[in-house]
Amino acid sequence: MSIRLYILFFFVLSTLSGISQQLSGVVYDAEHSVALPFVSVYLVETDESTLTDSSGLFSLKAPELKSFHIRFVAMGYESTTLLCAGDSPVITARLIPKHLDLHEVTVSGALSQAQSENPFHIESRKIDDLTAVAAMNMGEAIARIPGVYQSSLGNGIAKPVVRGLQGMRVVTLMNGLRIESQQWGGDHGMGITDLGLGNVEVIKGPASLLYGADALAGVVYFNDQPHAPTGKREIESKTLFQSNTMGVTQRFMYREAREKVRWQLGAGYGNHADFQLPNGRFAQNSRFNEAVLKSVLSFNGKRSVHHLRYTFSHTTSGIPGHTHDSLATPESFQVETQRRSYTLPAQFFNNHFISFDNKWFGERSELQILAGATSNRLIEYDEKVTIPSLSMSLTNALYNAKFVARPLGDKWKIIAGLQGMHQWNLNAENASDRLVPDSRTFDQGAYLTTQYGNARWNVQAGVRYDVRLLRAFEESVESFNRTYQGVNASAGGVYHTEWATFRASYSSGYRAPHLTELLSNGFHHGALRYEIGDADLNPEYARQADVTVELTGEHLVLLYNPFVNAIRDYIYLQPLGYDVDGIPAFAYDVLSEVAFYGNDVGIHYHPHFAHDLHFETTWSYINTRTPTDSSVSLLPPQRLQTTLKYSFDRNRKFGLREVNVMHTFMDAQRKVAFMETPSESYNVLDAAMAFELTGKQRWEFRLGVKNILNERFIDHLSRLKNIAMPAPGRNFYLSVQFKM
């Protein structure tokens, strides 16, 4: 009932008089001083947009603010964000032709702050760029970002690994809503598809200050695609076929925007059979299917903007490599026939995400309040058709309140915030096993941060306090009650010139032990292990130093980003060396301290003699240091990713738009934990090309091949490594996308 009252309260506040301030401008090519038509113009604070006309002119209505950000995006030009005064009658923007760009330069979805002004290095990528070579899921797509890997269980389940850490240490947000989807399990996916998403931002390392406790590895922040331009409607449909799984993925989005109200509706479906191995056989029970629905409703007041978002997803996924037979061989999980219909063992996931995001603007201040809820239903079937082995419901009610003050104008900013989450975890009565008891968790956090910047320098510092109350119940009787608390701080600075950017930052993080680490005592069939918790575990504390040096020339960009992340009381799963009913037993243990260190290096070269040719390579290196033996498992090996892209003339009605060739070298991993096996190095070569047909409607055709050489390899982070199951073999794909 209280949630309904909050929503009604916010809705009443939003019914103020409409926006009255008119904003107009013109966009030019900076080199040739010619007007640019069809440039996308985004007003960042209100999420409104429009297009320039044939003369480069644009007009839209803006809120009555002292200042605001306007972002200009055009194909073939560098994205530009301008900070404009509220009384600016006419705005002139000059876009620089894009010769090279190591990473997408956007305004951070969390702070409405240009990344060039952010002391903390953020990797930002468009979803379209990450899927230039088709990806099976979002985990695979974002693993193409330096320092980010994926831990997968076949094709249907994948989650991000950031600088060697995963699971509960990675916080995922979608448009500011924290996503909780039982991410503690290695066999549980993200619950997020690419439907309606525009870009993703990754903060690597402890990021608890603004995003809450637990983010020791970092934050993965997904942003929706922008609304249609005011007065316009857009229809987008995409179909993707992949030969390796004989799989089809369908996406559909409808967008419409009026003066005060904008909305989006979307639906998607995917169905994939068992994936084919390089030897021509198939990975038994690696099939999966998914369905997703999405809606967005946005509306504006005189000095406010409001977004109501809802997403539903359902996934059915087989569990490959599952067995109780201790004498099973790798060949027993490879079959001659590819199948699509699900068989046991299998997992079923239902996810509901709903959020109501509100912003009110003052003369020199801004108030943002987000209220939301997430619901995750997980059902695992092992061998019994009618009785699930696990059946759990995870429900979260959360809020995020943030106040931004600019007492001395835009140079100085003070941010104060409150965050809270109430979580219920319940087991179904009909499940045969209970991995963890029923529980309730209450999180509360408060933070204060300040930022100061000028034309060259930007500095930021802040502090945060978190408290977590955790209660567990056995047969409705309280059996466990703990309170955890922690204080974190961060500070950083950035200095930028026309040719260089230097960043240095320090941040700390705090993570209370999760319910599964404390109280597990049962079979986790999806992960194929018997897990035993430790009720006396202490919280983890992390401290990271991070430096970024970025040098930019006319035809070359160099980036060097070393880091050290030291974690105290590191919690890990320790194999016990024996089985329980044919399933290996593991217990949660603690390491006094472990240091993760390494670097990301990037090079983007654009030769002067070939303006349409782009060569980009990134190298990611991660290692650990512990006071005793290495108890850190699943440490990502060194990785070298190289992309060669050639863009063709876009002035033709139909033609080849671009060609992409991508090569990945994954080094061998010899640094392993107790009872963990090493991994060999491998090379994977992918290629893709895109054709475009323009007119009243725009058609895009993409075709490509993944794993062109049909390389047989087993990724070190694969959850199927223990049964020697290789990754998918050669995969031809074709996608058709329609926009109008």
Predicted regions and their residues:
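Periplasm-facing N-terminal accessory domains of Gram-negative outer-membrane beta-barrel systems
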Residues: I19-H103, R163
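A short linear hydrophobic-aromatic micro-motif
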Residues: T50, V148-S151
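Bacterial Sec-dependent N-terminal signal peptides
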Residues: M1-V26, V41, L102, M740
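Short beta-strand/loop motifs in extracellular/secreted proteins, especially
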Residues: P37-V39, F68, M168-V170, S365, ...
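Outer-membrane beta-barrel proteins, especially TonB-dependent receptors
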Residues: H99, T106-V133, E140, S151-L165, ...
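Conserved aromatic beta-strand anchor motif in extracellular beta-sandwich/beta-rich domains
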Residues: L43, T172-M174
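Short aromatic/basic micro-patch
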Residues: A35, S124, L173, G191, ...
